[in-house]
């Protein structure tokens, strides 16, 4: 359950380490984002020499969320942190590596590049 002002961890090597959500895509009244949803984020901390810098505004997709998400088979998936992957204008990841597991819901939402780069899909 990601909303405006939520602090997030970045799960790729784009150069950003921590970001803050500033908008949730999906209509005017949409308040929350869950696994596989796109958000706009502002970079709060970044590594020197990275692709993205502090204060940059980027698109990102949620790959891990603390709030449990119900699946079609009745099971639930929940993670220990809220994490995103930074995207470019075409919707592809800006980094070349993904750190940590990602949710299977990303495959349903057509983020195949992220799923293929991830070390584990839960």
UniProtKB/Swiss-Prot annotation:
Tell me the Gene3D superfamilies matching this sequence: Ribosomal protein L14
According to the UniProt entry, the coiled-coil residues are none
Q: Taxonomically, which superkingdom?
A: Bacteria
Regarding protein family, the annotation reads: Belongs to the universal ribosomal protein uL14 family.
Might you name a Gene Ontology BP term for this protein?
A: translation
GO-annotated molecular function: large ribosomal subunit rRNA binding; structural constituent of ribosome
Q: Which SMART domains match?
A: Ribosomal_L14
GO cellular-component terms in the record? cytosolic large ribosomal subunit
The UniProt keyword set, sorted, is:
Ribonucleoprotein, Ribosomal protein, RNA-binding, rRNA-binding
Keyword RNA-binding among UniProt keywords: yes
* Function field: Binds to 23S rRNA. Forms part of two intersubunit bridges in the 70S ribosome.
Q: How does it assemble?
A: Part of the 50S ribosomal subunit. Forms a cluster with proteins L3 and L19. In the 70S ribosome, L14 and L19 interact and together make contacts with the 16S rRNA in bridges B5 and B8.
Q: Report what the protein is called.
A: Large ribosomal subunit protein uL14
Q: Which InterPro entries match?
A: Ribosomal_uL14 (IPR000218), Ribosomal_uL14_bac-type (IPR005745), Ribosomal_uL14_CS (IPR019972), Ribosomal_uL14_sf (IPR036853)
């Amino acid at each position: 359950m990601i909303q405006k002002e939520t602090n997030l961890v970045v799960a790729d090597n784009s150069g950003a380490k921590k970001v803050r959500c500033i908008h949730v895509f999906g209509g005017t009244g949409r308040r929350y984002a869950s696994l596989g949803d796109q958000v706009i984020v502002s970079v709060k901390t970044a590594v020197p020499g990275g692709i993205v810098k502090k204060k940059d505004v980027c698109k990102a997709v949620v790959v891990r969320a603390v709030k449990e998400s119900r699946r079609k088979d009745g099971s639930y998936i929940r993670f220990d942190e809220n994490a995103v992957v930074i995207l470019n204008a075409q919707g592809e990841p800006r980094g070349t590596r993904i750190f940590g597991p990602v949710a299977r819901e990303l495959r349903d939402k057509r983020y195949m590049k992220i799923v293929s780069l991830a070390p584990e899909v839960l």
